[in-house]
């Protein structure tokens, strides 16, 4: 999957995560800001990275703003943002 544009998914509400995806040429880069980063930061990054790799993405910049989201929400938000970012403008308008 190729990331063609910037896209996001999620909210800044409690127990959710906002994932912003941007094209990159430098592999996978994840920037995380989290209310629970000391406790769960590595786990959140691992879920995001596994989701990215599972979708076949090789180059992407991800900014994640976590407000205590559970694993399933992190994965769903990441998948949605990646899918949105992989579509060109002509595909979105359909």
From Swiss-Prot:
Give compartment(s): Cytoplasm
Q: Does the keyword DNA-binding apply?
A: no
- Residues bearing PTM O-(phosphoribosyl dephospho-coenzyme A)serine: 14
Keyword list (alphabetical) reads: Cytoplasm, Phosphoprotein
Q: Cellular component per GO?
A: cytoplasm
Show the InterPro entries listed in the entry.
Answer: CitD, Mal_deCO2ase/Cit_lyase_ACP
What HAMAP family does the record tag this protein with?
A: CitD
In terms of NCBIfam families, this protein maps to: citD, PRK13253.1
Q: Which family does this protein fall into?
A: Belongs to the CitD family.
Its biological function? Covalent carrier of the coenzyme of citrate lyase.
- Subunit notes for this chain? Oligomer with a subunit composition of (alpha,beta,gamma)6.
Entry protein name: Citrate lyase acyl carrier protein
State the organism of origin.
Halothermothrix orenii (strain H 168 / OCM 544 / DSM 9562)
């Amino acid at each position: 999957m190729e990331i063609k544009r910037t896209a996001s998914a999620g909210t800044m509400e409690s127990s959710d995560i906002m994932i912003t995806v941007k094209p990159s040429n430098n592999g996978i880069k994840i920037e995380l800001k989290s209310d629970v980063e000391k406790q769960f930061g590595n786990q959140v990054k691992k879920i995001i990275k596994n989701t990215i790799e599972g979708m076949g993405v090789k180059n992407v910049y991800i900014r994640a703003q976590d407000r205590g989201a559970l694993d399933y929400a992190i994965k769903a938000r990441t998948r949605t943002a990646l899918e949105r970012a992989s579509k060109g403008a002509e595909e979105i308008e359909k």
